[in-house]
């Protein structure tokens, strides 16, 4: 376990070396440092995970105090690494999937300006996420939280010479900062009430000090939920994620699969004891997830950009995780987080291969017929898409998503179950719409398959993990998270499995019926009045950007214009202006004429005499 600090120190050192190189290193050397540092981190993590399983720590968790960070009066905080079943799972996902993404990126980014800078940012991204999941208190978690936010800004705006990319990065930074402010308020409340931010101490003290439904706990968990929805792109702070596709495709894979958007799920799961004492907020978590997964599913139906389709699918899949957390299916949420990392990384990396092969074309309707020219990318999309659609029994996504649906049913949340089934149907339609349109039909562009081990190896490994093989990896969460109500199954569970599987297959068949062949019905529907109305609405993500522009952006810009005219200084400027005006008037009396002075004396005396007589 003494190797545990190396998991985040290796990528941190990689970031420093690449930063100090200032782009003077060759691409091979930059790739060696950038990929190698994450590879060493993954090896360190593998050893830590092996040690955790082979020699289980007493109490099911291992703590390693590195140093005392701060001490002031009665307050002190140590920088301590905490490893239990939950952080072991996250450690494996972040370093394992992160390494595969870095390896693929070494191929994808060849020839790009800022090759070293790219790997410097991604190394810092991995280090920040590991800082987040290994810290034993919410303060250090928050530092990692802000670190991944900063890295997302840098990577989304990587092609900063394009103004739209800079705007997308700024939008992501601002929207997620809104959630971060809420989270900071939550930390203030918790520290004020308990005098500590150590997570394990909070989980012990909370039920001792407060009854279920306590106002302070409700406010604190609501604030933490605000932070989680911002970072995990859930309603109402989901608008940044689709625009985040402006960055390089491996960045999208990192954000969606291995790092940033899973942070909100991890936060709620890690603070599970606080949320169970605030049942109204826990219920709200499930509702937020259910609404998000349905709205994102409809939005994905009409997107034409291959990466934006996958971005909408990420919002939807994270919605399933929030739904699971909301019904108390803690294990199922983390299980789906893990399997989602496998197939979503696969889909994004495969989309990167397609984009490079098609000369950076991202519109799926300008592709077509790619299955013969890009067999590995096609296989990746078929397997990853099947896992995303939860094709029964063969894919990892089926087992994790089915567990969520069963827990929703077993806990009596029938409305959330219906939302999950609707989302499953939409997912299978939009996923295979992408596959049928991009890979089948008439070719519309020239495409050339990529080569090299850094291209095919990550895709091949993720293909295997996206099948049922990935579902065999069970997160060691026993004793870490509360046992869910639907832990045991039976006839009802098997029936639900068959129903959800049938829904997924029905969606795939419907997608084939609509998008293989002439697509006349789809074209006619899109041109109809209802089709244009809903298509525009869904394409623009239900109009949230328009609404926020009217409610927040335009009033803010108007306020900036008003303040730019300096109204305060102008108002205060009336005083010196009046004094100067009075002085100028009085100075007119100093004209050097004796008659004027005599008249002034007589006039002044008359005024004084009149005042005395009137008094």
Protein language model regions, located:
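Membrane-entry segments of alpha-helical transmembrane domains in multi-pass membrane proteins
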Residues: 1-9, 25-32, 75-93, 131-144, ...
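Hydrophobic core of alpha-helical transmembrane segments in multi-pass integral membrane proteins
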Residues: 38-47, 99, 187, 294, ...
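Hard-cation-handling environments
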Residues: 448-510
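Hydrophobic alpha-helical membrane-insertion segments
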Residues: 36-53, 179-189, 382-389, 458-473, ...
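Juxtamembrane "helix exit" motif at the C-terminal ends of alpha-helical transmembrane segments
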Residues: 390-396, 401, 469-480, 604-615
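Aromatic-capped, Gly/Pro-kinked transmembrane alpha-helices
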Residues: 74, 82, 480-495, 520-615
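Hydrophobic transmembrane alpha-helices and their helix-loop junctions in integral membrane proteins
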Residues: 86, 92, 96, 100-141, ...
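Transmembrane helix-loop-helix hairpins at membrane boundaries of multipass inner-membrane proteins
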Residues: 2-5, 21-120, 193-214, 239, ...
């Amino acid at each position: 376990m003494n190797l545990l600090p190396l998991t985040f120190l290796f990528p941190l050192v990689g970031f420093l070396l690449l930063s100090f190189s200032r782009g003077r290193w060759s691409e091979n050397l930059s790739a060696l440092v950038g990929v190698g540092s994450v590879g060493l981190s993954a090896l360190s993590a593998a050893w830590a995970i092996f040690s955790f399983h082979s020699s289980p720590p007493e109490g099911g968790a291992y703590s390693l105090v590195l140093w005392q960070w701060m001490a002031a009066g009665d307050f002190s905080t140590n920088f301590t690494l905490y490893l239990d079943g939950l952080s072991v799972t996250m450690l494996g996902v972040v370093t394992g999937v992160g390494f595969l993404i870095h390896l693929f990126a070494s191929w994808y980014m060849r020839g790009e300006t800022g090759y070293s800078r790219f790997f410097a940012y991604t190394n810092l991204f991995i280090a920040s996420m590991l800082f987040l999941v290994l810290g034993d208190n919410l303060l250090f978690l928050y530092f990692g939280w802000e670190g991944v936010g900063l890295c997302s800004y840098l990577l989304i705006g990587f092609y900063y010479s394009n103004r739209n990319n800079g705007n997308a990065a700024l939008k992501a930074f601002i929207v997620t900062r809104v959630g971060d402010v809420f989270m900071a308020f939550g930390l203030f409340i918790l520290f004020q009430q308990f005098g500590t931010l150590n997570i394990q101490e909070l989980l012990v003290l909370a039920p001792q000090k407060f009854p279920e439904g306590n106002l302070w706990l409700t406010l604190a968990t609501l604030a933490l939920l605000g932070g989680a929805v911002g970072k995990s792109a859930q309603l109402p702070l989901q608008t940044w994620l689709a625009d985040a596709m402006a960055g390089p495709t491996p960045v999208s894979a990192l954000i969606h699969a291995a790092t940033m958007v899973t942070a909100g799920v991890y936060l709620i799961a890690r603070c599970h004891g606080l949320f169970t004492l605030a049942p109204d907020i826990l219920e709200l978590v499930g509702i937020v997830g259910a609404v998000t997964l349905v709205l994102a599913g409809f939005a994905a139906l009409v997107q034409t950009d291959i990466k934006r389709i996958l971005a909408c699918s990420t919002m939807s899949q994270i919605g399933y995780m929030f739904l699971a957390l909301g019904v108390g299916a803690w294990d199922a949420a983390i299980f789906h987080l893990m399997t989602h990392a496998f197939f979503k990384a696969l889909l994004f990396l495969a989309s990167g291969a397609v984009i490079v092969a098609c000369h950076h074309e991202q519109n799926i309707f300008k592709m077509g017929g790619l299955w013969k020219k890009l067999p590995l990318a096609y296989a990746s999309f078929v397997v990853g898409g099947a896992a995303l659609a939860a094709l029964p029994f063969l894919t990892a996504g089926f087992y994790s998503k089915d567990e969520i649906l069963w827990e929703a049913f077993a806990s009596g949340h029938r409305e959330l179950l219906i939302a999950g089934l609707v989302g499953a149907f939409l997912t299978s339609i939009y996923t295979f719409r992408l596959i049928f349109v991009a890979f089948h039909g008439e070719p519309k562009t020239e495409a050339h398959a990529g080569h090299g081990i850094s291209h095919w190896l990550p895709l091949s490994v993720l293909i295997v993990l996206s099948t049922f093989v990935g579902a065999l990896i069970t997160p060691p969460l026993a004793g870490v998270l509360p046992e869910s109500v639907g832990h045991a199954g039976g006839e009802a569970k098997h029936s639900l499995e068959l129903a959800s599987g049938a829904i997924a297959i029905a969606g795939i068949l419907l997608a084939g019926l609509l998008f293989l062949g002439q697509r006349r019905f789809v074209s006619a529907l899109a041109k109809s009045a209802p089709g244009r109305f809903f298509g525009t609405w869904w394409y623009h993500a239900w109009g949230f950007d328009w609404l926020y522009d009217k409610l927040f952006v335009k009033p803010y810009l108007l306020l900036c214009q008003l303040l730019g005219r300096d109204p305060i200084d102008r108002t205060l400027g009336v005083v010196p202006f009046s004094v100067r005006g009075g002085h100028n008037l009085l100075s007119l009396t100093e004209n050097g004429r004796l008659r004027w002075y005599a008249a002034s004396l007589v006039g002044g005396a008359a005024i004084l005499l009149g005042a005395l007589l009137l008094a």
